[in-house]
A protein has these predicted regions:
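Collagenous Gly-X-Y triple-helix signature in extracellular proteins
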Residues: 1-225
Length: 225
């Protein structure tokens, strides 16, 4: 059923709570096809499916994708919740390169770490730039469930479908600004790059413990002839 896929198509695969009504069960997840290659396709969720921090604790050493808590959450909690064993067998264990921050590629404090192998991952800044050809195309809205978890929703910026957009994570380390004292200007600290509601990837990202930024899982889905 997937052999005729092309870039820009939307497919349904897996299930996750989305309408914020657990009583009617999980809803099918919609995925945007970013790339087709032989018998597999690179997908990213059409909507922001959840609202999670990069790290649940205060460890700023977990700024890299390979060591962050969100990677573990995607690879365990989300993977097991959203897909059946049969569906999981179709998700490729993929090489996930440690791309540099495209806004500050030479900054030694933004070392992306080592490449990983994951079934589910976040897009890098480079991949966002490669697969989305406009700011409007990068804008993404959250599901009612994600919004119930505290997802920030813009007042004016809308997706191409006319929905109000939100922030979503990439997997690149970034600088973030943190204000711990109202009498002192914000200080630069560790963060992770984001796509903002306008579809821009600003030079300063989100704090690692930030609770209002969304998750758009990505994966390589394999299919049989």
């Amino acid at each position: 059923m997937y052999n005729n896929l092309k870039t820009g198509d939307i497919i349904k695969f897996g299930s996750y709570e989305q309408d914020n009504n657990a009583g009617n069960g999980k809803e099918k997840i919609e995925w945007l096809v970013l790339k087709k290659a032989d018998n597999k396709a690179l997908l990213v969720s059409k909507y922001i499916l959840d609202c999670q921090p990069i790290n649940t604790g205060s460890n700023k050493d977990k700024q890299k994708w390979e060591t962050c808590d969100l990677r573990e959450w995607l690879s365990s909690t989300f993977l097991n919740s959203a897909f059946t064993p049969e569906e999981r067998s179709s998700i490729q264990l993929s090489h996930v390169p440690a791309d540099k921050n495209t806004e500050n590629p030479g900054d030694p404090n933004l070392d992306p770490g080592n490449s990983t192998y994951d079934r589910l991952f976040l897009l890098s800044m480079l991949e966002v730039e490669t697969y989305f050809n406009s700011y409007e195309a990068r804008r993404c809205a959250g599901t009612p469930y994600a919004k119930s978890k505290g997802l920030y929703v813009a007042e004016y910026d809308k997706t191409t479908d006319g929905e109000l957009a939100s922030y979503w994570w990439t997997r690149n380390p970034a600088h973030a600004m943190e204000q711990t004292n109202p009498f002192v200007p914000p200080q630069k600290t560790s963060g992770m790059a984001v796509v903002d509601p306008a579809g821009v990837m600003p030079a300063y990202g989100g704090l690692l413990q930030q609770l209002d930024t969304g998750v758009r899982p990505a994966m390589w889905l394999c299919f049989k002839d």
